[in-house]
Amino acid sequence: MKIFVKTLKGTHFEIEVKPEDSVVDVKKNIESVQGADVYPAAKQMLIHQGKVLKDETTIEENKVAENSFIVIMMNKSKPASAAASSASAGTSQAKSIPPSTSQPSISPQTPASVSAPVAPAPTRPPPPAPTPTPAPVAATETVTTPIPEPVPATISSSTPAPDSAPVGSQGDVYGQAASNLAAGSNLESTIQQILDMGGGTWDRETVVLALRAAFNNPERAVEYLYTGIPEQAEVPPVARPPASAGQPANPPAQTQQPAAAPASGPNANPLDLFPQGLPNVGGNPGAGTLDFLRNSQQFQALRAMVQANPQVLQPMLQELGKQNPNLMRLIQDHQADFLRLINEPVEGGGESGNLLGQMAAGMPQPQAIQVTHEEREAIERLEAMGFERALVLEVFFACNKNEELAANYLLDHMHEFEE
């Protein structure tokens, strides 16, 4: 019978197969038709309806009917030397991660308590890296989709919970929320994994800058590397030595702030938690350094929104760093206190409801994205591999409209999408 073989570039060709042919036989057939220099059988990967076909299975077992199509991809060659194989261990982990050690990038939002993805400022800040400018696109078609979450690559960085983290169920939720953040000894391995993933596309300083902008979230850092690092992250933070064990941490020096409206009036910037300046902290050594946040209506509203939708914490912290950098530095210095406060139960509604609405109004909304005719065809080809349109759109735009990168991600994480 006749079947069609499609490539990621949009071309296709036909071959003759038998229902009892194994996948290995089909690969050899493609090699003989197209040439060993173009499609060597050993490097071929065949996909049908979103699933990679195993070599030992047959065409009939995989339900490949006459005049149907399969998608062909080429596996990358692996280094043969032992030294090279040990050095590439981080790369293989970055490309394919078992579901037991990583969380799907596209998953329902269920945890009620979250951890703060806050990274301490490095003592040796790297110089700013140029932000890549996306090429202009001719607008011919419109696809309406929400702004995608970062999904170009999932790098698992298991971060242990700090001693002050809640115990029991809250601790479990914290572990889930923190599993995608790199910290401590895992940070260096995460940097190396991203460098290996890029294959020389980025230098180390650029990767460190992207991680700092993403508060050590590897997924968001990779997204920044493809789409551009926010300008706010390109300003190196001030290097600060850690506070000694016998002395309480002092808050950073206060910069002069403009006169603010009375406390009873509305706050024009809901994410500027203290428009009149930070209160005096550290007066009570027995209390948490950030306990003064409890009295802030803006923080109460932020906490309610984060507990309802944990994914808004990242953009909120980025905006907070712009509106109130002094408070952001204080949070970075006292992450455990911030985690404890952000996970405390929300009490009452009252005025915090209005502030919640103000914050929600400032969050990104679904927007119309223009695509060209070629990009629309690329989206349709990804759909033809057996994936849902919504998932294809999210991955395609998160991968900066790189069809091959999107296809690789979809195939590497298809077991997560099936769940």
Swiss-Prot record:
Q: Residue spans with biased composition (Pro residues)?
A: 119-135
Keyword terms, alphabetized: Cytoplasm, DNA damage, DNA repair, Nucleus, Repeat
Start and end residues of each stretch annotated as Disordered: 83-172, 235-282
Q: PROSITE patterns, alphabetically?
A: UBA, UBIQUITIN_2
Effect annotated for changing I47A: Abolishes interaction with RPN10
Q: Low complexity bias located where?
A: 83-118, 136-146, 245-270
> Tell me, which GO biological process terms does this entry list?
nucleotide-excision repair; proteasome-mediated ubiquitin-dependent protein catabolic process; response to UV; UV protection
Q: Which residues form the Ubiquitin-like domain?
A: 1-79
Q: What is its main location?
A: nucleus
> If researchers knock out this gene, what phenotype do they report?
No visible phenotype. Increased UV sensitivity in hypocotyls, specifically in dark conditions.
What is the tissue localization of expression for this protein? Widely expressed in the whole plant.
Provide a GO CC annotation, any one. cytoplasm
* Known partners and oligomeric status: Interacts with 'Lys-48'-linked polyubiquitin chains via its both UBA domains. Interacts with RPN10 via its ubiquitin-like domain.
State the family named in the UniProt similarity comment for this chain. Belongs to the RAD23 family.
Question: What's the protein name?
Answer: Ubiquitin receptor RAD23c
